[in-house]
């Protein structure tokens, strides 16, 4: 993996996760930067890669796809839909259209305060028009999808 990183055509745009630079902190060369490397992020990256490989990439992709489809079906049952066209959707980040007359920010606030569920608002031209629902990594589970759908149903 490091050989692939070392041979890439373009360098990292930031020192924060420049794997070549960070490799120096792990004993592969001289220390280049005078500040402390983001060690906690290195450990988080290591652990996330370990978990992904432990689960198996094919299994991980299948789990994300399955939970995306579960969310899509549950939203349909609530009369809601994803805004991105089929074929342009990400299984991990789902843009849900906010129904007319619904207080987008108010629903997000109630989801957080009453149910402990945080979702994101739309950005740019989608501000106030969509909710961004993440199903990434460990958070991509049937339990989380069902919990979100149940909470959303209670608020609409």
Per-region residue spans from a language model:
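Active-site C-terminal subdomain of aminotransferase-like
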Residues: 1-73, 77
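Small/polar glycine-rich anion-binding or flexible loop at a beta-alpha turn
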Residues: 68, 87-93, 124-132
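A short linear hydrophobic-aromatic micro-motif
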Residues: 79-83, 117-122
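Conserved PLP-binding catalytic core of the aspartate aminotransferase-like
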Residues: 81-114
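A common structural junction motif
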Residues: 111-119, 152-156
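PLP-dependent enzyme catalytic core of the Aspartate aminotransferase-like
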Residues: 125, 129-156
């Amino acid at each position: 993996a490091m050989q692939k990183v070392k041979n890439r055509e373009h360098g990292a745009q930031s020192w924060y996760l420049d794997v070549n630079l960070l490799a120096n902190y792990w004993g592969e060369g001289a220390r280049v930067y005078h500040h402390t490397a983001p060690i906690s992020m290195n450990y988080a990256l290591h652990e996330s890669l370990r978990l992904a490989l432990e689960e198996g990439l094919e299994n991980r992709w299948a789990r994300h796809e399955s939970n995306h489809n579960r969310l899509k079906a549950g939203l349909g049952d609530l009369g809601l839909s994803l805004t991105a066209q089929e074929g342009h959707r990400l299984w991990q980040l789902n843009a849900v259209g906010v129904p007319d007359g619904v207080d987008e920010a108010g629903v997000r606030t109630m989801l957080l305060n009453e149910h402990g569920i945080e979702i994101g608002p739309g950005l740019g031209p989608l501000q106030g028009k969509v909710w961004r629902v993440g199903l990434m990594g460990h958070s991509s589970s049937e339990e989380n999808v069902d919990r979100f759908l149940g909470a959303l149903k209670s608020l609409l």
